């Protein structure tokens, strides 16, 4: 088995074949980032029928090449840049760095079965991740535009506009206003442009929510049955988690989301502190779910929270414990969703009968 490490860049990719038995380079090739050059790469790689590809940052600069190789039936591993840096520093020339060394380092990580993660074809979760990212960008742009509009209204009229400003209320506020100076006329024109921008953002956010709902129905997830999980949070959870089976346990997923406490132990002292690591967007989503459930008296989350309070824990500790509990619960539901989707039609019929 030969491992082909790839150091991807925007315009070029460098591939280095490594024999794991001896950890030696057996060949290297540099190509341009184009389909024609991809084909040249695969022809070069056919010299090793039993091969695995190890692409550094396959979710970033190596994304297109990784998907192209998957379409050909190749086995592709994603190698974090931090892992290649460690290998390069410890075993491949210290501070020396070039594309060939980086590619060989990626192959070495894959051969050692360290931080490598197998890349799979894209699924509905990837579509949800794209829509969620777009929604976040739209929301930020809308908030920024509303803030600009508030600034103009403060300059146009005493007291400015109400805090909860919408395109409709902003239009109504301008309707009876008569600018008296040249700068005020410009402010009114700019305000009308910003109102049009807000209206457009609202329409785009509405369309985005509709697309998310369709994809969630297609996915068949049961996350929306959990108190506090609506379409937007469900899309974020699925999109940023990807395949839940890549986490070996609920504890591993909790660590990934940053909801697992960090142990600080020395001699006879053992304490746990809040984790500042993990996927912070997933952490934020789980926090939102926890806070919603705490405010719902009949929810399972509120029962769990009250149990911790009854044990003498502080509200902050109880909230963190609920987040950790929710992370495990969410992971199990996503695992069940994945297993259900993997069943064949005959298995579904057999279970129903």
Segments predicted by a language model, with ranges:
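Short glycine-rich phosphate-binding loop at a beta-alpha junction
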Residues: 50-61, 223
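Short alpha-helix plus adjacent loop in nuclease-associated cores
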Residues: 77-118, 130, 169-173, 269-277, ...
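Acidic, carboxylate-rich catalytic segments that either coordinate divalent cations
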Residues: 296-353
């Amino acid at each position: 088995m030969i491992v082909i490490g790839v150091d991807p860049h925007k315009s070029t990719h460098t591939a280095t074949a490594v024999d794991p038995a001896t950890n030696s380079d057996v060949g290297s090739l540099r190509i341009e980032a184009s389909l024609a050059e991809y084909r040249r790469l695969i022809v070069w790689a056919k010299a090793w029928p039993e091969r695995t590809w190890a692409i550094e940052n396959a979710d970033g600069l190596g994304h297109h090449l990784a998907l192209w190789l998957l379409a050909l039936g190749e086995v592709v591993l994603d190698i974090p840049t931090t892992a290649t840096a460690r290998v390069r520093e410890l075993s491949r020339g210290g501070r020396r760095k070039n594309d060939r060394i980086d590619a060989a380092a990626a192959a070495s990580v894959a051969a050692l079965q360290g931080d490598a993660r197998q890349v799979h074809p894209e699924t509905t979760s990837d579509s949800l991740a794209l829509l969620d990212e777009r929604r976040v960008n739209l929301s930020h742009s809308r908030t920024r535009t509303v803030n600009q509009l508030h600034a103009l209204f403060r300059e146009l009229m005493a007291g400015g506009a109400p805090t909860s400003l919408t395109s409709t209320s902003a239009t109504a506020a301008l309707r009876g206003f008569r600018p008296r100076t040249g700068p005020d006329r410009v402010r009114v024109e700019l305000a009308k442009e910003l109102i049009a921008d807000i209206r457009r953002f609202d329409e785009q956010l509405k369309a985005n929510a509709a697309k998310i709902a369709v994809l969630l129905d297609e996915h068949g997830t049961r996350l929306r049955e959990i108190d506090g999980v609506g379409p937007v949070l469900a899309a974020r959870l699925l999109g940023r988690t990807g395949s839940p089976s890549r986490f070996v346990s609920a504890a591993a997923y909790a660590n990934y989301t940053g909801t697992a406490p960090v142990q600080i132990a020395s001699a006879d002292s053992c304490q746990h502190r809040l984790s500042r690591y993990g996927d912070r967007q997933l952490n934020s989503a789980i926090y939102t779910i926890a806070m919603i459930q705490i405010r719902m008296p009949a929810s399972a989350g509120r029962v769990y929270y009250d149990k911790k309070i009854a044990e003498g824990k502080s509200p902050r500790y109880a909230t963190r414990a609920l987040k950790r509990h929710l992370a495990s619960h969410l992971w199990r539901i996503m695992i069940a969703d994945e297993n259900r989707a993997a069943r064949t039609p005959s298995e579904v019929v057999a279970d129903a009968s």
